[in-house]
Amino acid sequence: KNRIAEPLYVNAAYSQEAQYQDIELTSHEGQECDIVISGKLKVQVGTHWEILGPGDSIYYDSSTPHGMIAVDGGDCLFYAIVLNPSGEPIPELTAREPSMSLPQPAPAAAPRRDEGEHLWQRWIDAEENPDGSLKAIRFKNPEHFNFAFDIVDEMAKAAPDKLAMLHIDRDKTERRFTFADISRLSNRAANYFHSLGIRKGDRVLLMLRRHYQFWIAMMALNKIGAVAILASNQLLKKDLVYRFRAAGAKAVLCTATGDCAHQVELALEECPEVTTRILVDGEREGWRSFDEEYRMFRSTYTPMKNESRPEGEDLLFMVFTSGTTGYPKIATHTHTYPLGHFVTARYWHMVDPNGLHLTISDTGWAKAMWGKLYGQWLCEGAIFVYDFDRFSAADILPMFKKYNITTFCAPPTMYRFMIKEDLGAYDLSSIHHATIAGEALNPEVFHQFKKATGLSLMEGFGQSETTMMIGNTLGMTPKVGSMGKPVPLYDVDIVNPDGQSVGVGETGEIVVRVDKGMPCGLSRGYFDNAQGKPISSVRNGLYHTGDTAWRDEDGYYWYVGRVDDLIKSSGYRIGPFEIE
């Protein structure tokens, strides 16, 4: 009734660039009805927006500024029907500035911090701008640093009752660990491992899911100087055989959950060099029981007189990372690595010393070192750990309010699962800051989360071989879809195949210049078991990430892809050889 125009048959062409910009809004008298035929259409009316699919329609007062774009990677066909009850001719359409557009990103504000004396100041000199953002960073005597002794044990002395970890089991059992608890229990574990013949430089593979025992074992190995090898509990026999041999493992700590121990047993039939097998969170014939045995040992630990203190450039841990040819390589990190995550935790995660931080990651991946251990404890913050069997947004979302989680980090895949829930049904007001990394950030994820929480997702970039290199950090206004800017810790550049810097807007490979020294946090190379040491991956003074990006006129970096054939899945790098 009172239709004054034939339906317009509109083909909205998909534009990648439009996904990162405000929708251009127009207005005119009357009403409008849009009906989608194929594809996906994002329609914004005032500050409200909807994603429409085939068969969906929307009806609105067209005097309200409105606009639409095709989304989801393809063109969209739709009918646009304009109606006017008065029957007057349709006035000329006029474009308006998007003053009623979606809430815009805002600079990250500093969390409430106690600016008194902190343990990290003994090792780190952080020069900050007036707004609290990082201007420059220097390290004091990193060659003598040992995280377990110099942070955990010292925190146990300075603030013994301060919460270090709130752990939730798969059956929802709650356990609270103070820094004094972690110090004492890791001392027992260090003495236990030492009694089993594990010494400085020995490699120990950990397959522990998110069991609380992982943190105890890691600190114990840090104290002994044994090298932890991070591994997923999803590995099968062939994966384990390769890892045991490639890393020269002497011992394995394995979860009793699932089929993990059985797969290890199958692998050990071909790997007699792995002489010690320890089961965690259960008992099994032929295995030592970590939980039953380590508590019997002393709660104080001092290296033997004939053993040097592990520190500085001694190896700390290894993590397998995918390559395009052959099996995964073994990235190595030294005892200076945790210092690099000070930037990750303080200026990107915005860890509050009086808050509770949650990063979603299994301990078999380097992401756990980013958000579940080193940087957070270095900043004197507590970590929240939930040892779930399978990720469920509906299971995790109520925990933010229940446990007052203040900062949060996850890959885009997890955020997408969360957004599929009705976020309005959950109280997320405890979250002060949210970060995202691991894959390219879809603008829809950014806007949906912002709509539900009022928080801008702050994207960051790094690798298993590094700490955070590029990010939307404290004081920055994020550009949706951008990784942010390089942090002062790393001398980051974008280069062409000849190693020359490229100009604004040109795509090239992200590299780190190390001609002036190796930054704390950058891998010392890939481990070669035949030589018993890491082999440097630096070429002509550059560490090559294998990732490509371009840089805009404001210095923000925009991710493009890999220079090789690696595939990203839920934030993990997977090589084609592994898939075969």
For the regions a protein language model found, what residue spans apply to each?
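Conserved AMP-binding/adenylate-forming core of the ANL superfamily
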Residues: 161-219, 236-241, 293-295, 335-336
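Conserved AMP-binding A3 loop
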Residues: 176-180, 309, 316-340
